[in-house]
A protein has these predicted regions:
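Residue-level detection of the helix-turn-helix DNA-binding "recognition helix"
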Residues: 81, 92-94
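Short, solvent-exposed secondary-structure capping/transition elements
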Residues: 71-79
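Short, basic-rich loop-to-helix N-cap that marks the start of a DNA-contacting helix
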Residues: 94-106
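N-terminal flexible/basic segments that precede or flank functional cores
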Residues: 1-56, 111-154
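Conserved hydrophobic/aromatic packing and binding residues within compact polymer-binding modules
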Residues: 62, 76-77, 87-90
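Short coil turns linking two alpha-helices in DNA-binding domains
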Residues: 72, 83-86
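Generic structural signal for hydrophobic core residues of well-folded globular domains
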Residues: 68, 108-112
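Short, amphipathic alpha-helical "recognition" segments used to contact nucleic acids or chromatin
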Residues: 55-71
Length: 154
């Protein structure tokens, strides 16, 4: 037996990802069994959504983009012209990422996903901090075609 649920996908490290209409199975004891099919496609969908968000990146989002691109802190630091310790400070929220470095990270993430996130001019306007954190909503009804949904303002 199975049913569809809206599942909070904390396993990715972002803490604000909702998989809409995810199919979960019910085992013989009546407990829900959650499996995330096609997780690589899901993470690529999230990577594009995070890289293209309309406000500044949060520390956990910087870490998510870096790890999804398969980079160490030192490698990301080299990519943006900083050291690995600076990247660690950004990811721990000890210091904010500079606008130019955030733009490079976003462009690299889009390139990694074989997508253009947006233009440099547009990215420059998206690096300002947000007043509140919006969830990332993913349509999980068809795991072969995950797609981002627009978050409703709180």
């Amino acid at each position: 037996m199975s049913r569809r649920v809206d599942y909070r996908y904390d396993e990715c490290g972002l803490g604000n990802v909702i998989l809409k209409d995810l199919t979960v199975c019910i085992d013989d004891d009546g407990d829900e069994v959650v499996t995330i099919p096609n997780v690589n496609l899901l993470h690529q969908t999230l990577l594009v959504q995070v890289a293209g968000k309309e406000s500044g990146l949060l520390p956990k989002e910087i870490r998510f983009l870096r790890t999804e691109m398969g980079l160490t802190q030192a490698q990301l630091g080299q990519l943006v012209g900083r050291d690995g310790q600076s990247v660690g400070r950004w990811e721990r929220g000890e210091m904010p990422i500079e606008q130019a470095h955030e733009m490079i990270l976003r462009m690299a993430a889009g390139e990694h996903a074989d997508q253009v996130v947006t233009s440099m001019m547009e990215l420059a306007t998206r690096t300002m901090p947000a007043a509140s954190e919006r969830p990332y909503l993913i349509d999980a009804s068809d795991p072969d075609h995950y797609r981002a949904l627009e978050a409703v303002a709180a």
